[in-house]
Amino acid sequence: MKMMDANEIISFIQNSTKSTPVKVYVKGDLEGISFGDSAKTFLNGQSGVVFGEWAEIKSVIEENKDKIEDYVIENDRRNSAIPMLDLKDVKARIEPGAIIRDQVEIGDNAVIMMGASINIGSVIGEGTMIDMNVVLGGRATVGKNCHIGAGSVLAGVIEPPSAKPVVVEDDVVIGANAVVLEGVTIGKGAVVAAGAIVVNDVEPYTVVAGTPAKKIKDIDEKTKGKTEIKQELRQL
């Protein structure tokens, strides 16, 4: 897994073509109307649907207001710099409502649950589950076979570019609603209790809890049983 450099992300955002895509349901005398070079139209007689950039389509609507009887616009972003990740060929289970931006790496057999928000430059390892409403900030990196509990936040760092991102090593379990601050590394096999706020690095194979999180014990057999990762949930 390759972590994206902060300056690469900054350059990507700076140089991207900002986009305000819209979907327009349109009705009227549409014959001969061009909705712009980049638009895709699905017109049938006097009605249809147009996909394209708002700046182009807005001009067309204004110029042809005598021909266009009515229209409805669907729009969910303005001057967006980063598109959503194309999910069609990702070898993972991604449930409805997850928001995953472009330039995110997702390993095979990972699971992304409803409402998760995953920002640019994040890395998710093979077999890792990102539970409901988790937030992975920019460049947050999670290893293999982890479980990030519902509502948890792994803080992101894109600026300042010198800042170190959150790194979660393999086989880590993070409980619900935990917060891991910028620059923290969670060591291999560690467990972070629900609701913990982690401000310092966590040693491998230890359990931390509290606000701020502190070590309460080393991993033992009882803890392993309570935090077992089930591969059956990760099968495609």
UniProtKB/Swiss-Prot annotation:
Which principal EC class is assigned to this enzyme?
Answer: transferase
Q: Which residues cross the membrane?
A: none
Return one GO MF term: tetrahydrodipicolinate N-acetyltransferase activity
Listed EC numbers: 2.3.1.89
- Please list the coiled coil stretches: none
Q: Name the catalysed reactions.
A: (S)-2,3,4,5-tetrahydrodipicolinate + acetyl-CoA + H2O = L-2-acetamido-6-oxoheptanedioate + CoA
- Record-linked Pfam families: DapH_N, Hexapep, Hexapep_2
Repeat is among the record's keywords: yes
Pathway this chain belongs to = Amino-acid biosynthesis; L-lysine biosynthesis via DAP pathway; LL-2,6-diaminopimelate from (S)-tetrahydrodipicolinate (acetylase route): step 1/3
What are the record keywords, sorted? Acyltransferase, Amino-acid biosynthesis, Diaminopimelate biosynthesis, Lysine biosynthesis, Repeat, Transferase
Please give the biological process terms from Gene Ontology that the record holds.
diaminopimelate biosynthetic process; lysine biosynthetic process via diaminopimelate
Q: What does this protein do?
A: Catalyzes the transfer of an acetyl group from acetyl-CoA to tetrahydrodipicolinate.
Question: Could you say which protein family the record assigns here?
Answer: Belongs to the transferase hexapeptide repeat family. DapH subfamily.
HAMAP family of this UniProt entry?
DapH
- For this entry, the protein name equals 2,3,4,5-tetrahydropyridine-2,6-dicarboxylate N-acetyltransferase
Species of provenance: Bacillus velezensis (strain DSM 23117 / BGSC 10A6 / LMG 26770 / FZB42) (Bacillus amyloliquefaciens subsp. plantarum)
